[in-house]
Amino acid sequence: MVTELKPKVETISICGIDGSTNLDTVWKLPDLPITEAYGEYDENYPKFDQELMICMSCGHLQLKNQVDPNFLYSIDNYAFRTQNNNKIHKEFEFIQNFLSKLHLDSEQIRAIEIGASNLELAKFLNQRNKFKSFAVCDPLFSNQEKFNESGIEVIGKLAEDALEDIERLAVNFLIGRHVLEHVLNPQLLLETILKNIDPKTIFVFEVPSLELLRKNFRFDAIFHQHCQYFDETSVKILLQKLGCELLLMEFNKEGSNGGSMVFAFKKQDIKNAKISSNDSIGFIQKKFSELKIEIEIFTSAFKVLGDFIKYLPGRKAGYGAAHMLATLNYHTGGAIEDLDFILDDDELKNNMSYRNIGIGIVHPDEARIDENVIFVPTSYENHRRIIKKLTEKYPNRIITGPIF
């Protein structure tokens, strides 16, 4: 199969948090592959130069280049949808516990979820909280019925195109789970929504946490689909720019992409507004220097891991057909393609492959495994669980990377 697509790439020239153009490169990633691309292998599948940038005015991190979203998020090229498994249920419970601390009057809540991708979170929250009404908003729903079987209204649009619907529904609670990191300009999107929504609306967002990504050395989770990399400081600066007040912020160490951050806010009462000073120059320079060191450690460690995998003789197998496998292969210098196969417990992935990684996926029940097979955990989202399973089930040698 030969890929003839030549997707457009646009340069992101302003910070999505404060609008500054004072951006500097932290990390160059030439020919970075697309993640989550399951399908028939194509050696010519597109790769794109990428850079991780830091705003020298506020310290926020974001990508330099935006690959055409029509390519990135097409059904053929983007696998992620909110899944239905134990890990996701734990993340939903975390959000529910977070909401309970906001002491919402559920019977008065008219909720909308933006960037829903499917109805799983909406069903979960609506069942647990008995909101007055619940709607979901995502272009993926453009061909679906207005109401689903759970009484949830479906709006097949981008949030910025659904402002009349938001007004019609008298929304006073808006939630978005893993949405803002995909948005080119979060400040502009939220400004637009704030101008067209009840001023007392409570907003709740979950995003990957840059703090936890750095702490866990999950720099493999820097990838094309995530334009923005939030930490506590950048969220607070964003809210200040929007004239909003932070109500609550919590970190989920077991969240996606190394860990997540959930925060709630609302429009600030002008009478009580406080403009905090940001002594940022020294802080940003320190952050820039620390990131450079952390990235150097990461790249060195994964190069060693890749060299070791390639050096090992005999049969070698990965465990975990992860969404991020393409970036793991990238940072290990193609070592994942030196494995014989990838095991995965998901029966739907059996005999599948990746469009940009030359390796097949096999269910454990279908694989020929003996005591000489060497295992490499290849899903860092489930790293500990995989090591535990391998230790209990297979008396084999296990090669782990620098992530725990």
Where is each model-derived feature located?
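Extended interfacial segments that mediate partner engagement and assembly in macromolecular machines
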Residues: 46-51, 59-146, 223, 228, ...
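Conserved SAM-binding loop
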Residues: 98-217, 227-244, 327, 342-350, ...
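Short aromatic-enriched loop/helix-cap "lid" or pocket-rim segments at secondary-structure transitions
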Residues: 30, 37-38, 148, 215-219, ...
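Short loop/edge segments at beta-strand edges and connector loops
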Residues: 138, 156-157, 250, 361-363
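Contiguous mid-protein beta-loop-alpha structural module that forms a pocket-lining wall or clamp
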Residues: 213, 217-285
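Glycine- and acidic
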Residues: 78-82, 174-178, 216-222, 290-291
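Hydrophobic, well-ordered beta-alpha structural blocks that scaffold small-molecule cofactor pockets
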Residues: 98, 103, 124, 262-404
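N-terminal juxtadomain amphipathic helix
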Residues: 2-85, 250-252, 264
